[in-house]
Amino acid sequence: MLENCGSRKLPYLRLDQTEVVPKTIKPGASIRYRLSYTACISQQSPYIPGRLVTKILFKGKAEDIRSDDNYSIETGKWVVDTHIAVPKDANTGAYVLEATLSTKERRLQDYVSFNVER
């Protein structure tokens, strides 16, 4: 069984890997954020309801927030790719992408940075 799901407290979530590509972009371009995770849920249900939220922060202030409040979490290894367009009038500097994948019982959170340069 995947990740020894039977021996874990369920639901189980593990963040496997994240990345932003490219790390430096120009205003008007886009980035790809990849979140890979492993999940184990009870065999009584094919999935559990979850929530996936991404925030783009500049100098600590949220510039953009996206939320999928009906995200289905199933047992397995999963990859979520999010493409984000950076506005043409975006300020130059360091940005932080904050991602949160959560259920009622569990929460994964990730922070990755990227730069906008002219």
Spans of features found by a protein language model:
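Contiguous segments within soluble domain cores/interaction surfaces
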Residues: 2-84, 94-102, 107-108
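Repeat-unit-sized solenoid/scaffold elements
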Residues: 69, 117-118
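Surface-exposed, short loops/turns at beta-strand junctions within beta-sandwich domains
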Residues: 88-92
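Edge beta-strands of extracellular beta-sandwich domains
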Residues: 109-115
